[in-house]
């Protein structure tokens, strides 16, 4: 084996099994999606500075524990038909209502979205298939982050919207 210097992020994909044990599913030298959205919501520091110092080999490992006190939850809103053939072109409304739910504690990350240009010159935000949006909420406790996240999920509308209703539930059982 050759020794290779690794300077990047390492994503560990975990799955909690039926017995409550965390199992490693995969390793990737990239950020996980949508897991990163939840991490970024509670990151207490400058992500660019952290990544730069890792890349040039000056990362102070004592700064890695720079996650703010709190918890986060991210729920993916997918287009109808996901994970198979998905709908496209459905107008997305009320994102602002979701983001305004709790000042600074709810973020909406775009994935499968597109702008549709109307003949009258107006534009509308539409689905573009697959994972459409990642709704992320943070709070002091996991229970409150999950509650806030699903409240925001209910405020965003588009035809065929689908999402899991159990995100974070296993974490609550562990706590």
Language model features with spans:
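Short, small-residue-biased leader/transition segments that mark boundaries at the very start
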Residues: 1-5
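A short glycine-rich, hydrophobically flanked beta-strand micro-motif that places a catalytic Asp/Glu
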Residues: 6-17
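Protein kinase-like catalytic core scaffold
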Residues: 10, 23-25, 131
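Interdomain hinge/lid region at the active-site interface
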Residues: 16-23, 27, 31
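Glycine-rich phosphate/pyrophosphate-binding beta-alpha loops
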Residues: 28-40, 81-83, 114-116
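Peripheral (often C-terminal) accessory segments that flank ATP-dependent C-N-forming ligase machineries
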Residues: 53-175
């Amino acid at each position: 084996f050759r020794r290779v210097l690794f300077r990047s992020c390492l994503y560990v994909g975990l799955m909690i099994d039926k017995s409550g044990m965390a199992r490693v599913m995969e390793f990737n030298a990239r950020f996980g999606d949508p897991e990163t959205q939840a991490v970024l919501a509670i990151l207490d520091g400058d992500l660019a500075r952290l990544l730069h110092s890792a890349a040039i080999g000056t990362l102070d490992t004592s700064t890695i524990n720079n996650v703010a006190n709190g918890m986060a939850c991210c729920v993916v809103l997918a287009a109808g038909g996901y994970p198979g053939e998905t709908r496209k072109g459905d107008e997305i409304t009320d994102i602002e209502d979701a983001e305004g739910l709790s000042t600074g504690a709810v973020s909406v990350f775009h994935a499968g979205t597109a702008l549709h240009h109307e003949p009258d010159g107006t534009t509308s935000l539409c689905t573009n298939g697959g994972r459409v949006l990642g709704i992320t909420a943070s709070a002091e406790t996991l229970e409150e982050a999950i509650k806030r996240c699903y409240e925001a999920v209910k405020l965003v509308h588009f035809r065929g919207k689908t999402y899991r209703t159990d995100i974070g539930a296993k974490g609550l059982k562990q706590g």
